[in-house]
Every structure is written in C-alpha cells, then in structure tokens.
Amino acid sequence: MDSACKPTQRRLDAAGFWQIWQRFDADEKGYIEEKELDAFFHHVLTKLGTDDAVMEENVWKMKQQFMAAHDVSKDGHIQMKELACLFLSEDENFLLLFRQETPLDSSVEFMQIWRKYDADSSGFISAAELCNFLRDLFLHHKKAISEAKLEEYTGTMMKIFDKNKDGRLDLNDLARILALQENFLLQFKMDACSTEERKRDFEKIFAHYDVSKTGALEGPEVDGFVKDMMELVQPSISGVDLDKFREILLRHCDVNKDGKIQKSELALCLGLKINP
C-alpha cells in the first residue's frame, strides 16, 4: 500500500466503494476529476452513516487529508487506487485493483483463463468456479486467505461484476475483471489496402495469435482470434456465442480436420495466397 495513503477508521467494502466510484466514472476511464472530490467524499461519508450536521466539516477534512498526501496530476485526474486505499482494507483494495496492476496482453491469454475456470464448459463462470479463480489469484500473489474470507470475496466480486444479476459471470464480465487490453484487430483495415499490405497485416495477425509459435492456431489461440474477430462486428459476445463461432470457423478453415487452423488454412479462408 502507498505509504502516503492512510486509511480512515471507517471502511467500505470493495462492492460499496465500486458502487460509488461508478457514479462518478460511469464510462470506466479509471479516474475522476479533482472538481468532483467534494461530491465523491459526500457520497462515501453518507454511505458510512455520517451525521448531516457534521457532513460539510468532515468532507472538508477528508479532502484536506487527501490533497496533503497526494500530488494530483496537472490534468486534475485522480486515479481510483488513490481513493480506494483511503476506505478499503488491504485485501479489499487488492480485490478491486489487482486487474489494474496486471492487465492481460492478449485475448489468447484471456481465453486460457476462461477455459480453465469455466470447468464445465457451460459458457459461464459460476460462483464456485469464480471462487477457484480467486483462490489461485491470491496464491499467485502470495497472499494468505481463509476459506471464509474467500467465500466473502467471491460474493463481493459477483456483486460488482455480475451485471445482469443471474448469479454467474459471462465472457464480458470476466473481461472486465481482468482488464483485457484493446482488441488487437482494431488496428487493421483489411478492406482498404493493397494485396501486399494485406499479406503483411496477415503475417502480423497470425504471429500475434500463434502464441506457441507452432505455425498453427489451436485451443485458446483459436478462441482468442474468434473473440477479437467477432467483437469487430458484435461488441459484446457470450461464451455460448463464442463456442458457436469457433465451431463455424473450424468447419470452414480446418481443411485437414486436425482441430487446428494452419497458417495456410487461415490465409485461404481470408482469400489470401501466401508463400509456403
């Protein structure tokens, strides 16, 4: 925890903090403006049960404490982690912010995680499967946690990220938890360039998804490519949809039926002729 960050005596949980944060950062930029601080602290203190009679005084004190401890950037942006550590315990802080510290580089990495924890291949992550994910996450970061706390944090994560409140997480919910980087394919415009440029772009695209460097896309590499490709035309796809699109792609591209997509097979699917 930042040494300049001294938590207040009264604490929120991660779900409570997230609920307030979203009011001010609705489009999830990851920061709020300095001019919003008073209103933000007012919401926090209201949630913590502060008496109206001392509200303004406490908001002022809290703002002074915060401004003394933090060097607000010239653009007036205040990051979520700067405020979270004032109101959350260390574990709750970690739960909310670990995704900002370790964002995923590619959809292939994301799909490896999705396939591992969607153990029953239902196309959703259940609370029990999310609990397994969090257990591994805490172990990976060398943080000890009891089973009781783990269950509590699983409930917190479901509260924060289960958008439609159906008791399970879909592909998009997990992508939000893991702070997946921007779709790799967005940088390419395959319909607006020459054949040579398309070939060059194809080489870059294939190299990006062929993480294992085998010359063929398989398993989560196919998943990652399908996810990014479909999200170019359909911004939000479910795990069930992804499996359908994956099956269609393999049916069309996997000429030798080995369950993989060779480089030459994908080129053929995209109408390109490449050197062997």
Swiss-Prot record:
> Where Ca(2+) 5 is bound, by residue?
254, 256, 258, 260, 265
> Domain EF-hand, which positions?
12-47, 58-93, 105-140, 149-184, 197-232, 240-276
Q: What CDD domains does UniProt report for this protein, alphabetically?
A: EFh_HEF_SCGN
The record lists Ca(2+) 3 as bound by: 162, 164, 166, 168, 173
Sorted alphabetically, which keywords does the UniProt record give? Answer: Calcium, Cytoplasm, Cytoplasmic vesicle, Membrane, Metal-binding, Repeat, Secreted
Q: What is the lineage of its organism?
A: Eukaryota, Metazoa, Chordata, Craniata, Vertebrata
Instruction: Read off the Pfam families from this record.
Output: EF-hand_5, EF-hand_7
| Protein name according to UniProt | Secretagogin
PROSITE patterns attached to this UniProt entry: EF_HAND_1, EF_HAND_2
Report which superkingdom the organism of origin falls in: Eukaryota
Check the record and name the PANTHER family matching this protein: CALBINDIN, SECRETAGOGIN
Q: Name one GO molecular function term.
A: calcium ion binding
Q: What start and end residues bound the annotated signal peptide?
A: none
Its gene is SCGN
Matching InterPro entries = Calbindin_Ca-bind (IPR051001), EF-hand-dom_pair (IPR011992), EF_Hand_1_Ca_BS (IPR018247), EF_hand_dom (IPR002048), EFh_SCGN (IPR035798)
Positions binding Ca(2+) 4 in this chain are 210, 212, 214, 221
- Gene Ontology CC entries for this record: cytosol; dendrite; extracellular region; nucleus; synapse; terminal bouton; transport vesicle membrane
Can you tell me which residues bind Ca(2+) 2? Answer: 118, 120, 122, 129
User: Where found, per UniProt?
Assistant: Cytoplasm; Secreted; Cytoplasmic vesicle, Secretory vesicle membrane
Q: Which Gene3D superfamilies match?
A: EF-hand (1.10.238.10)
* KW rRNA-binding (keyword) present: no
List of residues binding Ca(2+) 1:
71, 73, 75, 77, 82
Topologically, how does it sit relative to the membrane?
Peripheral membrane protein
